[in-house]
């Protein structure tokens, strides 16, 4: 098995810590909030408010399940438009009250079903991209498993984008890439090599800003490493004026 194939397998492993795990372990007194106030709550997206070193922070994440029933409830981590609208509601609330935003991303992509399209999946993702680019509080996005397509990017227009070591971030799945390019989804490992989807490759290209080492999925070291990094980064970002914060975010994505 190639290194890319190993990372792809580990990124998709059901045993990985989830967005909710990170929210509860890193932030004190985390309170989950629900609903987009338009249609319904989406179990694939979690969000709420917690405290980090006494500072209130808004946390949003894409949640995969840990077993079959949980995955059915979470739609296998594929958000509907109401999930992205819930995320945006919480981020705009954070802006109103001056809270920083931290997002945790693990999704193969936004849900492509008929109902999701009818309710404006494309519009919901596009609106998140637009609103996050101008959100007047610090944003940190962390890829904790799969970072698939616009479904991941809809929570990743951030001042800093980080990845755990054994995760991926890509425009679509390697299987989808192979199917489009060669009409053969079984060539996904070959596609993954071409796509440059691993954390090390993306760090070298300047697409992500930090790679957090992993020593297994379940260790407290990962929690502590992420917590320390978030505390340090938010302290730096909070020193910037709103104008400088937004300009730096704009330039970060403009360079692509």
From Swiss-Prot:
NCBIfam families xrefs: accA (TIGR00513), AccA_sub (NF041504), PRK05724.1 (NF004344), PRK12319.1 (NF008971)
Pfam families in the cross-refs: ACCA
Family: Belongs to the AccA family.
Protein name stated in the entry: Acetyl-coenzyme A carboxylase carboxyl transferase subunit alpha
Keywords linked to the UniProt accession: ATP-binding, Cytoplasm, Fatty acid biosynthesis, Fatty acid metabolism, Lipid biosynthesis, Lipid metabolism, Nucleotide-binding, Transferase
Superkingdom, taxonomy of origin: Bacteria
InterPro entries in the cross-refs: Acetyl_CoA_COase_a_su, ClpP/crotonase-like_dom_sf, COA_CT_C
Enzyme class: transferase
Functional note: Component of the acetyl coenzyme A carboxylase (ACC) complex. First, biotin carboxylase catalyzes the carboxylation of biotin on its carrier protein (BCCP) and then the CO(2) group is transferred by the carboxyltransferase to acetyl-CoA to form malonyl-CoA.
MF GO annotations: acetyl-CoA carboxylase activity; ATP binding; carboxyl- or carbamoyltransferase activity
Organism: Streptococcus thermophilus (strain ATCC BAA-250 / LMG 18311)
Subunit structure, as described in the record: Acetyl-CoA carboxylase is a heterohexamer composed of biotin carboxyl carrier protein (AccB), biotin carboxylase (AccC) and two subunits each of ACCase subunit alpha (AccA) and ACCase subunit beta (AccD).
PROSITE patterns (UniProt xref): COA_CT_CTER (PS50989)
Subcellular location: Cytoplasm
């Amino acid at each position: 098995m190639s290194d890319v194939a190993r990372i792809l397998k580990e990124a998709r492993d059901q045993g990985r810590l989830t967005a909710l795990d990170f929210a509860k372990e890193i932030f004190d007194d985390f309170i989950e909030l629900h609903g987009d106030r338009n249609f319904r709550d989406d179990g694939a997206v979690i969000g709420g408010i917690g405290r980090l070193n006494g500072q209130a922070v808004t946390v949003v994440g894409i949640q995969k399940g840990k077993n079959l029933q949980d995955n059915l409830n979470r739609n296998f981590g594929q958000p509907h438009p109401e999930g992205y609208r819930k995320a945006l509601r919480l981020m705009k609330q954070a802006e109103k009250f001056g809270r920083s935003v931290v997002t945790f991303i693990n999704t193969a992509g936004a849900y492509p079903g008929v109902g999701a399209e009818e309710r404006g999946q494309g519009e919901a993702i596009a609106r998140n991209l637009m609103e996050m680019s101008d959100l007047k509080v610090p944003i940190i996005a962390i890829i904790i498993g799969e970072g698939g397509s616009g479904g991941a990017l809809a929570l990743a227009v951030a001042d800093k984008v980080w990845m755990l070591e054994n995760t991926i971030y890509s425009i679509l799945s390697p299987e989808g890439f192979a199917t489009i390019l060669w009409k053969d989804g079984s060539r996904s490992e070959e596609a993954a090599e071409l796509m440059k989807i691993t954390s090390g490759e993306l760090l070298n290209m300047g697409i992500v800003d930090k790679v957090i080492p992993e020593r297994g999925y379940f260790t407290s070291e990962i929690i502590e490493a992420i917590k320390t990094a978030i505390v340090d980064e938010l302290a730096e970002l909070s020193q910037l004026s709103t104008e400088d914060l937004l300009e730096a975010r704009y330039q970060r994505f403009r360079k692509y």
